[in-house]
Amino acid sequence: EATTAIPDGAEITVDATNGIVYEGVVADLVKPKAAEASGGTAGTTVVAAESVPVTGTKIYMNLGNPDLAEKYGTLPCDGIGLMREEFIWTTFIHEHPLYLIETGRPDHVVDQLSEGIRKVCQALAPRPVTLRLSDFKSSEYRNLKGGDKYEPEESSALLGWRGASRYYDPKYVEAFKLELQAVRKVREEYGFKNLNVMIPFCRRVDEMQKVVDLMAQEGLHRGPDFKVWLMAEIPSNIILADQFNQFVDGYSIGSNDLTMLIMGCDRDNDTVAPLFDERNLAVKRAIRHLIAVAHKDGKTVSICGQAPSVYPDFAEFLVKSGIDSISVNPDAVISTRKHIAQVEQRILLDSLTGKGRADTEDYTW
């Protein structure tokens, strides 16, 4: 198709890793040919940027600031595994959604959210973008203009009114509908069908059903071209994965909250912070169990915490457990892809020779 759509003589940049053709010369993907040894100036011929290996495990990227999407979109990632919506709220919207509704300005939410999301989808297209819907805690919502009128004072906001529990609550549902309108605008008006969504902090299976039903009522029907992911960050998501499966297309493990809740350990508390460790056997068993149960029903599993890029042994554990994708910060995309490629090669070699190292821990659930 490209050979007929691109006119002869046109300058293009081909990203062979991701299967993308860019119009013109994309400076971030190419570098100038070195100056001739005779002392001549650098030529205009371009050569490929740093080569990166192809991996069976998809390497996604985490992103918060939409204005950085074009810059980081040139990285050899397979898409956005976690787009944080909160950055748009604090940087461009500034005001509590219920306050904006009360003052007659709900369109401000839809316009700002859709514009930020559009930038990311456009920069990454046709690669998928997974938007995590709002996950502010009540204390963070109170910091938005007008928020003190609508938000409770919670002694433990981390475990309070956040994530999915807000979406269907009569006190907040109209605000959540604005988020869904923004998603629909990006997909339908702007035409970026590479946008999918992720539901954070969903404690119960019936909550997940309520959220999926609510999205359908707002014109966002889960299907082949619109995926709904669940942020697996609560032990109930792991224990009841066989039931959550019927309402989701996949999971993205939020290793920070999941570790904290499994270990009963506040990583922000200096006294017990040393006990916080994603590599603890309890966490590993939970992750491996989730992958097995999800795969049984054809669901995919990703992880979007920092652990895979910080601890090479943890990344190896994930690949050996069969994880489908890993999402890391932009500065870790290339190094993580290289490391994962080495792990996959090692696994293949061990399989061929039958002389691989046995697991040193028992991951049986």
Please tell me what each predicted stretch does.
Residues 1-7:
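Conformationally flexible catalytic loops at phosphate/diphosphate-handling active centers
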Residues 6, 18-26:
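Short, Lys/Arg- and Gly-enriched loop/turn segments at beta-strand edges
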Residues 27-32:
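Acidic/polar low-complexity surface segments
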Residues 33-365:
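Conserved alpha/beta-domain cores
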